[in-house]
């Protein structure tokens, strides 16, 4: 086994996880993610299916991208509450955006930063896709993993 040291630009910790942004990589905090998240030993992992802008009947609630982001975030909060986890427990998120544009990315970051007041950003990937399999007109889906 090889050992190595990471010279950290910034390391944030909460009770469950360590969020690391190594020196030599760009600072991702303006984009709402961390390069590395370490889950401390003995923590439970929660795997959340993709959440999107649906109502309780599984119907898409809006065609506007910003409104879909807001409803998706609301649904994520509902799912997290059911599992008794918070945004600070999220260690990885994958965001699928249909018909991706830089404008959509900026809207996502703006809405999410208002909704999530945290300094412990999860590791994150945005995946542009031609369409989503959730509902016709759905433009965003977010799946995530939490550790607590």
Regions found by a protein language model. Name each.
Residues 2-74, 78-91, 100-148:
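N-terminal presequence-like segments and the immediate start of the first folded domain
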